[in-house]
Amino acid sequence: MGNRNLKWPASVAVLSAVALAACTTAPGPETRAAPPQPEMPAKVRPSEIIGRWGYAAYHKPEDRARTEANARGQCKQPFVIGQGPNGGVMMYLADSNQLQELRLKGTPGGRDYIGPAGETPGVQDREIVSFDGRVLVMKYVDPEVDGRYGTGVFVRCAPRA
């Protein structure tokens, strides 16, 4: 009977020590996410694309010329790219009916994108495939979205008379 009485206090002491040790362990080293890289400026400036545009889209590269002609015909009901309050441009993201300010962003490889602030290219961005001041061609970075919307052709509309 004497041995059983000694085991109980010893068991309580061991369990208490283990529980106390678990409470006093030092936390591991804190890992912090790297700060986001600053956005590179795009070669295309927001002021160059603000205005009234005819818009059409294509899925097959051989349809580009026809699509450009169709876009020119859409100037009766233009797609308006406005100036954003913070220096960006006001446009719609895919699947959104809300205008929002988007940024023109560059990359070290020389490609330009239009999209929300953040990673470049981001999943919501559009790549500026070409721009000559009169015709702006853009495609969505996300392949699924690009498959639905196609490559967009914007043709600058003549100034209002």
State where each predicted segment sits:
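Short, solvent-exposed coil/turn segments
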Residues: 13, 74, 147-150
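Short acidic, gly/pro-rich beta-turn/loop elements at beta-sheet edges
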Residues: 63-65, 101, 148
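Beta-sheet ligand-binding and adhesion/scaffold domains
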Residues: 27-39, 110-161
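Amphipathic/hydrophobic helical signal segments and adjacent flexible N-terminal regions
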Residues: 2-63, 67, 153-161
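N-terminal short leaders/motifs
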Residues: 34-43, 80-95
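Contiguous, well-ordered beta-strand patches that form the walls/edges
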Residues: 59-61, 84-133
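Short, surface-exposed polybasic-and-hydrophobic patches located at secondary-structure transitions
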Residues: 66-78, 84-85
